[in-house]
Curated annotation (Swiss-Prot):
The keyword Secreted applies. GO terms for cellular component: extracellular space. Keywords: Antibiotic, Antimicrobial, Immunity, Innate immunity, Secreted. Antibacterial peptide active against Gram-negative bacterium E.coli. Has no activity against Gram-positive bacterium M.luteus. Weakly active against M.luteus. The keyword Secreted applies. This is Cecropin. InterPro entries: Cecropin (IPR000875), Cecropin_insect (IPR020400). It comes from the Eukaryota. Induction: By bacterial infection. It comes from Calliphora vicina (Blue blowfly). GO terms for biological process: antibacterial humoral response; defense response to Gram-negative bacterium; defense response to Gram-positive bacterium; innate immune response. Belongs to the cecropin family. Pfam families: Cecropin.
């Protein structure tokens, strides 16, 4: 029923959040590498 629908929505949001977090970490890692190389 509607509970399952809401659960699916929350799951999708969680997936997006996780993807964004992983992407953000990757970008931060790259920036750290660039900073280390620039020194």
């Amino acid at each position: 029923g509607w509970l399952k629908k809401i659960g699916k929505k929350i799951g999708r949001v969680g997936q997006h959040t996780r993807d964004a977090t992983i992407q953000g970490l990757a970008v931060a890692q790259q920036a750290a590498n660039v900073a280390a190389t620039a020194r």
